[in-house]
Swiss-Prot record:
The gene is prep. Its EC number is 3.4.21.26. It catalyses: Hydrolysis of Pro-|-Xaa >> Ala-|-Xaa in oligopeptides. Keywords: Cytoplasm, Hydrolase, Protease, Serine protease. GO terms for molecular function: oligopeptidase activity; serine-type endopeptidase activity. Pfam families: Peptidase_S9 (PF00326), Peptidase_S9_N (PF02897). Belongs to the peptidase S9A family. This is Prolyl endopeptidase. The keyword Glycoprotein does not apply. One of its GO terms (cellular component) is cytosol. Disruption phenotype: Resistance to lithium due to elevation of inositol (1,4,5) trisphosphate. Gene3D superfamilies: alpha/beta hydrolase, Prolyl oligopeptidase, N-terminal domain.
Length: 760
């Protein structure tokens, strides 16, 4: 098929001069910088023209529509995402079938009956009331829930939401009361009767008038008396309206921690609790101590986990008396991470840290009320080791009311859970159903623990555990018509990275009837390799669809740069070592071909965000190896990423181009700056982005595809396409219909490029 790509305006007068350690001053041209102006009529017209070209390729037939319909049919089953108990109330997230967004429900815990033999799902959920339904706010699913924070009693809930996929959040508040507290007008009487019929102990939900705007990556925590809450936000950007949130490219600076008192209408009334104007790029996280006597504030200067730690021990007094908050620096030299876990009445405070422990450990610090705090840079704090570092990664620590620690570890990218007492004595392992991923939900206020477990071929199942006996019981499992986990296989292999021979883990999933030895199986491989994030197993009905429809193989390459093996593994794929990520991924492809799983003509790869950068880099470096590439919301311009929205925080992984040493690394792999100019070979590629992505702004993809089409559009016959989704952002919270349309287009792209005939 011949492609008539749009004639994108190229301005060769735009350039920057960078300082290079290797070459002195270097001039780098940036002819498509005008595409960074997302709101310009020229850019909008260009987007429409590019989308038209992409649709002309995808819509040669109705394959996308057929795939979308089939996947939607497979998704037509009841599924539960999470359960959280507060007081006597149980909140849970449920999608009854194919709604764009999950609904949040509420029920009294006493109305749930759990099977004593642990072999069948709990019952009583039909009595739950609808607490929050995002689908009522937008028909197309572009209103999405970002955070959901329940107070200790369960009587109040703060939730934040976003629109059109933007990272900007707004905060709203709901209150839960009994129907006896409702005022007795006609409508309320009808509501009371309806609730009685549902036999739901007469809970009712009241919307409070509080509304807070211009939050991003916010950390919300309720105060002790539930009269207000802590959160953090940025100043409102100067040149953007509420309707255009997510389309601006301004750098996000001057994050502050605020206190909001219930009843105050909006953020203009809120009190600043903590700020650091001399370090405007810092972002803050907050956590109240177990007894709410202290507020801990973590200050992050970038995306590294290492942070400073501050404590306010007079928080309640300062709120009650409207006096000043006394901020004390506990950690002030970014030497490690210190995540607060809990504390005892005797003043022993527990923290998860990587201090002298790249795989992490649990320590405690003694903080007495009458003891002044001297920061660690000036006085060596006395750390007591509770759980020593092991040779596998400590991921998280939770506690229950029984004063036990439930410690989640990751060993070779498989989750295990161990139980310890507060002295660090090992008690037992929690026996999980098998290899896979487990997420644990517990609080110190009750004995109930919920564990979600899944892997690539097993749907997410929720288990319940009483911390008095730590017995794992089935709580809720999905029923997917026609699906059996036993029909599929998932195995883990280890291969050598081609240059330095580092062993890299990789998951391979396929249907047992698939021939994985002929070297001809259609293969869909993905990876991430960044920001200390581990790419763990999770179940996806869409991936199962690929295994079935393509008779194919799905692969996760756990390349360096992630958190799979702790700090050293992350650093081995960051900054000057970033090339290791690309080499590892290239090595994964070579392994699959060498071991006769697939061949170059049947290999499709996909990655998003930092994984989108991975796709751009490997396409430039090994265009002969990959037949089909899909890059979602990728970071493609490595010389300018730090100048837009939250990009300045990514320098922890990438470095920055105004540093001569970093420039010499970035210029060698930046996808935008390394498009081959004289090649007659390049993978079929489709970039996917959203016009409201304010994390990795769409200009990264706009500029990269423009350069590809300019340099190679008339030299190669492979498609060089971009799919720009309207009213979409970086991906989080995307509605089911948008997700489905996107994956249908991607699988359609796979089938056409890999020459796989799909039978419908």
């Amino acid at each position: 098929m011949k492609f008539n790509y749009p004639e994108t305006r190229r301005d060769d007068s735009v350039f920057d001069i960078f300082k290079s350690t290797e070459k002195g001053s270097v001039k780098v041209y940036d002819p498509y910088r005008h595409l960074e102006d997302q709101q310009s009529p020229e850019t909008k017209k260009w987007v429409d023209e590019e989308n038209k070209i992409t649709r002309s390729f995808l819509d040669q037939d109705n394959t996308s529509e057929k795939i979308s319909n089939e996947i939607m049919k497979m998704l037509n089953f009841e599924r539960f995402d999470w359960f959280r108990r507060r007081g006597s109330k149980l909140f849970f997230s449920r999608n009854p079938n194919t709604l764009n967004q999950n609904i949040i429900y509420l029920i009294d815990i006493d109305q749930i009956s759990i099977s004593k033999d642990g072999k069948s799902s709990a019952k009583g959920f039909e009595n739950a009331i609808e607490f929050l339904n995002p689908n009522t706010y937008s028909k197309d699913g572009t209103w999405s829930l970002k955070s959901f924070v329940i107070s200790k009693s369960g009587d109040h809930v703060c939730f934040s939401y976003s629109k059109a996929g933007s990272d900007w959040e707004e905060i709203a508040v709901k209150k839960i009361i009994t129907t006896n507290e409702l005022k007795t007008n006609k409508d309320d009487e009808e509501e009371k009767e309806d609730l009685k019929k549902k036999n739901c102990l007469h809970y009712a939900v009241v919307d409070l008038p509080d509304s807070i705007n211009w939050c991003k990556f916010t950390s919300i925590k309720w105060d002790e008396n539930e009269t207000g809450f802590i959160y953090n936000r940025y100043p409102k950007p100067e040149k953007v309206s509420d309707d255009d949130k997510g389309t601006e490219t301004d750098t996000n600076l001057n994050n502050k921690v605020y206190y909001h008192k219930l009843g105050d209408a909006n953020e203009s009334f809120d009190r600043v609790v903590f700020e650091c104007p001399e370090n405007p790029q810092w972002i803050f996280g907050t956590e109240f101590s177990h007894d709410h006597s202290s507020l801990f504030i973590s200050a992050f200067r970038d995306c590294n986990v290492e942070h400073n730690l501050y404590v306010i021990r007079n928080f309640q007094e300062a709120i009650a008396n409207k006096s000043a908050f006394k901020v004390e620096a506990l950690i002030d030299n970014f030497d490690a991470c210190y995540y607060y876990i809990t504390n005892t009445k005797q003043g022993e405070y527990f923290f998860l840290t990587n201090l002298s422990a790249p795989f992490n450990r649990l320590i405690s610090i003694q903080l007495n009320d009458d003891q002044p705090i001297v920061p660690n840079s000036k006085s060596k704090l006395e750390f007591k080791e509770i759980i020593p570092e092991k040779d596998y990664v400590l991921e998280s620590v939770s506690r229950s009311s029984q004063e036990k620690f439930y410690v989640s570890y990751q060993k070779h990218v498989q989750d295990i859970i161990e139980v310890y007492d507060f002295n660090g004595k090992y008690l037992k392992d929690i026996k999980l159903p098998g290899p896979g991923s487990a997420s644990l939900s517990a609080t110190e206020y009750h004995d109930h623990i919920f564990i979600n477990f899944s892997n690539l071929v097993s749907p997410s199942v929720t288990y319940y555990m009483d911390s008095k006996n730590d017995e794992l019981l089935l709580f809720k499992e999905p029923h997917i018509e026609g699906f059996k986990s036993s029909d599929y296989e998932c195995k883990q292999v280890f291969y050598e990275s081609p240059k330095d021979k580092t062993k890299i883990p990789m998951f391979i999933a396929y249907k047992k009837t698939t021939d994985i030895t002929s070297g001809n199986a259609p293969t869909y491989m993905t990876g991430y390799g960044g920001f200390n994030i581990s790419y763990t197993q999770s179940f996806s009905i869409r991936n199962i669809y690929f295994l079935n429809k393509f008779n194919g193989i799905f692969v996760i390459a756990n390349i360096r740069g992630g958190g799979e093996y702790g700090k050293a593994w992350h650093e081995a794929g960051s900054k000057k070592n970033k090339q290791n990520c690309f080499d590892d991924f290239i090595g994964a492809a070579e392994y699959l071909i060498k071991e006769n799983y697939t061949n170059q003509n049947k290999l499709a790869v996909r990655g998003g965000s930092n994984g989108g950068l991975l796709m751009g880099a490997i396409s430039n470096q090994r265009p002969d190896l990959f037949k089909c590439v899909v890059a979602d919301v990728g970071v493609m311009d490595m010389l300018r990423f730090h100048l837009h929205t939250i990009g300045s925080n990514w320098v922890s992984d990438y470095g920055r181009s105004d540093n001569p040493d970093d420039f010499d690394v970035l210029i060698k792999y930046s996808p935008l700056n390394n498009v081959p100019k004289d090649s007659n070979q390049y993978p079929s590629i489709m970039l996917c982005t959203g016009d409201h992505d304010d994390r990795v702004i769409p200009a990264h993809s706009y500029k990269f595809i423009s350069e590809l089409q300019y340099q190679l559009g008339k030299k190669v016959d492979t498609p060089l396409l971009i799919r720009v989704d309207k009213d979409s952002g970086h991906g989080a919270g995307k509605g089911l219909s948008k997700q489905n349309n996107e994956i249908a287009d991607i699988f359609n792209f796979f089938s056409k490029v890999l020459n796989v005939k799909l039978n419908f």
